[in-house]
Regions:
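Solvent-exposed helix/loop surface patches that form functional interfaces
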Residues: 113-213
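Hydrophobic helical h-region of N-terminal Sec-dependent signal peptides
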Residues: 4-10
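C-terminal segment of classical bacterial N-terminal signal peptides
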Residues: 12-15
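Acidic, serine/threonine-rich low-complexity disordered tracts
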Residues: 17-110, 168-277
Length: 277
């Protein structure tokens, strides 16, 4: 399914939040600054529906994002996991590996929307995580294996694994003024791949938020058996005072060789308020 998910990401990038010379909507009224801190909660539920391999995983994370430095072209941010819980019907041993990230500071470079680019000091992060693995009770052979697996990951995959929620937030945090309305990427087929996507933008009545939604569908008819299909729906509320999302929900449904439903919800806690006019 890797190739199909790459097509999903391509479809998302193809339907960019549109610009317009007139009637544009603000997306960020105050610039990012060093010292900014925001608290988020992330809730994920994944159900694998393949016969004979059914499973369910539920996790909840609470984390803080601090701006360490801000420039027009990008940010330096710090991610700190504050609390975590996880249940997995097929692998109950995953929760300690997640909980070991609690308290580990992860500084990273990001683009202007907050999308992670690279970790600033992976060796320090690795060593802090190793100490936490010992603190949560993993024996030495298990620690060696977990750290070895992390060490051999490509840098981009490691960033995605640790900071996946940040990428979801950044997907819905445009840094250019946008135009209200509905915008479609027409259905198109290239070889075995067929895809379509839709984006809509509308202002909130209070003047402090924007509602953004993205829907896309990608089908791969190549190979034997049924076609692989991915459908993804994302809805979010952007707090235009600071340009960061107050809530994002993404539902991804796959069918074909892999059958699953994943729902991810990330929201700020406490929710940002609208300044009195």
């Amino acid at each position: 399914m890797i190739g199909l998910m790459a097509a999903v990401l391509l479809s998302l990038s193809a339907v960019q939040t549109p610009e317009g010379p007139a009637g544009v909507l603000d997306v960020q009224r105050t610039t990012d600054a060093a010292g900014d801190r925001r608290l988020f909660v992330s809730e994920t539920e994944l159900a694998v529906l393949d016969p004979g391999a059914e499973g369910r995983q539920i996790n909840r994370l609470r984390f803080e994002i601090e701006t360490l430095a801000a420039a027009p072209g990008g940010l330096t941010l710090r991610y700190r996991l504050l609390d975590a819980s996880l249940t997995d019907s097929r692998n109950p041993g995953l929760e300690p590996l997640l909980k070991a990230w609690v308290g580990v500071d992860v500084a990273f470079s990001a683009d202007a929307s907050g999308r992670p680019i690279d970790l600033m000091d992976w060796p320090s992060v690795r060593d802090a995580y190793a100490a936490r693995l010992q603190a949560v009770g993993l024996d030495e052979p298990a620690r060696v294996k977990v750290l070895g697996d992390l060490e051999t990951l490509p840098a981009g995959a490691r960033v995605s694994m640790i900071l996946g929620d940040m990428a979801l937030l950044a997907d819905m945090q445009p840094r250019r003024p946008v135009t209200a309305g509905r915008f479609d990427q027409p259905f198109e087929r290239q070889g075995d791949l067929a895809r379509s996507a839709t984006l809509s933008v509308s202002p909130a009545p209070d003047g402090c938020g924007l509602s953004l939604t993205r829907s896309l569908s990608v089908e791969n008819a190549g190979g034997a058996g049924p076609a692989d299909i991915v459908r993804q729906d994302i809805s979010s509320t952007l707090h235009v005072i600071d340009g960061w999302s107050s809530e994002v929900t993404r539902k991804t449904t796959t069918s074909g060789r892999v059958n699953s439903v994943e729902t991810v919800r990330v929201f700020r806690d406490p929710r940002p308020t609208c300044p009195a006019s």
